[in-house]
């Protein structure tokens, strides 16, 4: 029986491989679904410099795997923000968003940021 940790690791590796070739042709900020089941939701996001993702929220915590790292500003709908420095090939933990808040991801660097996001559907 596959443990949840092994499953997430396997899923992450598969998403990384599937998304890598696609990233080479992306010309705008985009979010592309990769996989979803009752346990996880996985997508790839490519965020171009100064071309933020629309306001959105995350009900569940998530792991960010940086395919192409950079400096990401996460700004909520009240204007508060935090800066994340993501290194290529590294994974990062982000908690779920506080109730009733929205945020947007803004690449404040000079090169596209590409990440795989693994959102844990059963965690709060």
Language-model features and meaning:
Residues 1-11:
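Bacterial N-terminal signal peptides that target proteins for export
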Residues 29-54, 59-64, 115-118:
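A short glycine-rich, His/Asp/Glu-containing loop-to-beta-strand
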Residues 21-23:
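Boundary at the C-terminal end of the N-terminal hydrophobic targeting segment
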Residues 9-19:
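Bacterial N-terminal signal peptides
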Residues 50-54, 90-105:
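Histidine-centered metal-chelating micro-motifs
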Residues 58-78:
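Glycine- and acidic-residue-biased ligand/ion/polar-headgroup-sensing regions
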Residues 36-39, 79-97:
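Short acidic-glycine-tyrosine-enriched beta hairpin
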């Amino acid at each position: 029986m596959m443990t949840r940790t092994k499953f997430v690791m396997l899923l992450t590796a598969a998403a990384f491989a599937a998304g890598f070739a696609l990233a080479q042709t992306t010309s705008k900020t985009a979010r592309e679904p990769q996989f979803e089941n009752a346990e996880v939701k996985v997508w790839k996001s490519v965020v171009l410099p100064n071309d933020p993702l629309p306001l959105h929220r995350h009900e569940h915590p998530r792991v960010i795997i940086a395919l192409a790292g950079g400096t990401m500003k996460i700004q909520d709908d009240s204007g508060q923000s935090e800066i994340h420095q993501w290194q290529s090939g590294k994974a990062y933990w982000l908690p779920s968003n506080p109730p009733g808040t929205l945020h947007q991801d803004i690449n404040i660097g000079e090169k596209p940021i590409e990440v795989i996001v693994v959102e844990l559907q059963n965690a709060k």
